[in-house]
Amino acid sequence: MVGYEPLVPTTLPSRLVSIAAYRWKLWKHDGVKTRERTVLITGGTGSFGSTTAQKLLRSESLHEIRILSRDEAKQDDMRRRISDPRVRFYVGDVRDFRSVNEAMRGVDYVFHAAALKQVPSCEFFPQQAIATNVHGSDNVIRAAAENGVESVVCLSTDKAVYPINAMGMSKALMEKLAQAFARNNPGSETVVSCVRYGNVMYSRGSVIPLFIEQLSQGKPLTVTDPGMTRFLMSLTESVSLVEYAFENAQPGDMFVRKAPASTVADLAQGVARVMGVEPDMRVIGSRHAEKLYETLLSVEEVSKAEDLGDYFRVPLDARSLDYGLYTDEGSPGLDQGQDYNSHNTNRLSVDQVADLLMTLPEIQKLVSSRAK
């Protein structure tokens, strides 16, 4: 974001403009001291939480990072790995409002990353997906509002667009909760927004570590569907997306980062190429409720989206529930365009996939160790 100036919205009340300016300063490392802030990351022991925490710890405006998660073993691992007294851990579950509320007291900003994310698991246990991704998200938003939190950024997924699986449906409802809060509470001091992204390479649950393990053991690469496409984003880019939303969001906004895509077959070939292996490939068929391609913005969202260079912003539909408007006046016509999906975005070749993989620290370390 070189040369980028945050879009502090002049249409917001002066109180929210001031909040937006403070949000920007949290991420700046220019020696300018502002009031120290406290950040809560739900589900913070995962890949996103660890990377975000390490970045925030470089800020002059940080007072404390709170990590709320269920797994005390992962918390202990993270505590040893980061070893900074400004990181404080809370064992709790977003499903339990009391534990969320306790962690929320005195917090200025929230990054809501806690979720059930595995598509097959959510298909077999949809009630658990609802409990965490829907009711848990509602607890986070409600506790944030009750404690005067200034900004909440909710992490969503491309599977929330045209959802066909329980995971995507539950995430779509999380987005609706965030938008409904913004629409129904226009005077709230809490700005709730969402970000939506696709596959984060080498994050927990990514297929890339599986491919590496299979190649290391001399096994064939198991590919669900060779023509299946997925968006590809690095962990650093996913954190930058949240940072961008944090700096710029108006109530109810949705932000998406533009991203390239690859077929599953080309991704597998790219992993094999960086490892210097000629792979055998075995097609095993798609898993429960998987799509051939994923969508980051629907046709309807594209028609309203603001193009911000590397990002899209979809503003909140802030109309009131006045039925007369729907029956008498209606809404403006929608553009007859297309959605933004992993089939029509920039498609990477095998060579380009390999080059992209080589930007990941985990792959660089792996290649270096194999060269010794």
Regions found by a protein language model. Give the residues of each.
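Rossmann-fold scaffold of SDR-type NAD(P)-dependent oxidoreductases
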Residues: T42, M104-A113, C154
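Strand-loop microenvironment adjacent to phosphate/nucleotide-handling motifs in alpha/beta enzyme folds
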Residues: D30-R37, E146, K176, A180-K372
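Conserved Rossmann-fold NAD(P)-dependent oxidoreductase catalytic core, especially the SDR/UDP-sugar
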Residues: H112, L116-A172, K176, A180
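Conserved glycine-rich Rossmann-like NAD(P)H-binding loop of the short-chain dehydrogenase/reductase
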Residues: S61-K74
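Conserved residues in the N-terminal Rossmann fold of short-chain dehydrogenase/reductase
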Residues: S69, V91, A131, D225
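Conserved Rossmann-fold cofactor-binding substructure of NAD(P)-dependent oxidoreductases
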Residues: R88-Y109
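N-terminal Rossmann NAD(P)H-binding glycine-rich loop of SDR-like oxidoreductase domains
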Residues: V39-L57
